[in-house]
């Protein structure tokens, strides 16, 4: 073989990367025109409140940052790839009126450590367990979005006695049963190493919000963009979190997740195929689906009041059903 020439597979990868870069140029220009380089940004979000001092838990050598707010039954909120505790700002304060809300920076983002090497959803579920132990919480309901939904499933499988109820938002069942990521997002992930950080963020913002929100409420996109720029994530950590989600595969164990489960899915999600909600519901023995028509991947940014109502109503109904004595 001529060592001066690139192998065939490398040439093909290069061509695909160039096509992926071309595929995202037009959406980037479109979003850039919508947001504008001088668009005013107001960081005050509906439902936002002052946070208490950050607490620190440890899972072995890894330090994890988290917050506690509110009183009531414990409710853990777990974010997805590239988003820290700040991602719950539209809903955390509202939820804290009814629950003791725990928000966490996953490993690889925010004030938590960014250890080198591979991450896994099981590893990150153990991080959540370490936070519960540090906070003195024996049992909690768990809300997980995207990668956070996979982490929540792992937590329920590994430590079922610590999980009361589950709310899984815009997530997947994992493994071969998962429906593939929409093509545009696949192109974005392929092109990400060739893009500037700001360009990648602009495209991510466009893909994580529904088209109706982008068209009618561009301020939501501006706020989200501002928060992402204010809380950058190391590229290596973004890749490690992304890989953890791609490798998530419960291998048929989900039948063991018997906790009452609400699956929440936006019908205009461009990151997770909305059909995954039905697949996941078919695998969990005690699950139901609630759809947000026209909402995207970050549906709790687009419809915060409705999201809080859905979570609150579900937890109240599940608690009421559990309190009804069964007849022999």
Which positions does each model-derived feature cover?
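Conserved alpha/beta-hydrolase "acid-adjacent" motif
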Residues: 270-276
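Short beta-strand/loop motif that positions the catalytic acidic residue
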Residues: 257, 263-265, 269
């Amino acid at each position: 073989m001529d060592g001066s020439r690139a192998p065939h597979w490398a040439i093909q990868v290069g061509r695909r990367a160039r096509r992926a870069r071309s595929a995202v140029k037009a959406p980037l220009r479109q979003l850039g025109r919508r947001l504008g380089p001088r668009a005013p940004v107001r960081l005050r979000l509906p439902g936002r409140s002052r946070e208490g001092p950050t607490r620190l838990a440890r899972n072995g050598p890894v330090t994890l940052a988290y917050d506690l707010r509110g009183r009531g039954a414990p409710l853990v909120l777990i974010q997805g790839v590239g988003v820290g505790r700040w991602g719950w700002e539209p809903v955390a304060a509202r939820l804290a009126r009814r629950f003791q809300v725990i928000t966490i920076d996953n490993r690889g983002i925010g004030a938590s450590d960014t250890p080198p090497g591979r991450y896994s959803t099981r590893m990150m579920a153990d991080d959540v367990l370490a936070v519960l132990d540090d906070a003195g919480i024996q049992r909690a309901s768990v809300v997980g979005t995207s990668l956070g939904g996979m982490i929540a499933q792992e937590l329920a499988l590994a430590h079922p006695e610590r999980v009361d109820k589950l709310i899984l938002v815009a997530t997947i069942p994992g493994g071969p049963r998962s429906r593939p990521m929409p093509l545009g997002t696949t192109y974005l992930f392929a092109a990400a190493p060739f893009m500037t950080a700001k360009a990648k963020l602009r495209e991510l913002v466009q893909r994580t919000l529904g088209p109706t929100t982008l068209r009618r409420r561009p301020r939501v996109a501006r706020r989200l963009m501002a928060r992402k720029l204010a809380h950058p994530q190391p590229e290596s950590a973004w890749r490690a979190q992304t890989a953890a989600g791609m490798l998530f595969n419960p291998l048929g164990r989900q039948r063991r997740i018997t906790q009452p489960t609400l699956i929440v899915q936006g019908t205009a999600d461009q990151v997770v195929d909305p059909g995954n909600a039905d697949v996941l519901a078919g695998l969990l023995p005690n699950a139901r689906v609630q759809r947000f028509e026209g909402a995207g991947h970050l549906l709790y940014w687009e419809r915060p009041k409705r999201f809080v109502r859905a979570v609150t109503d579900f937890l109240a109904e599940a608690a009421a059903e559990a309190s009804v004595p069964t007849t022999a």
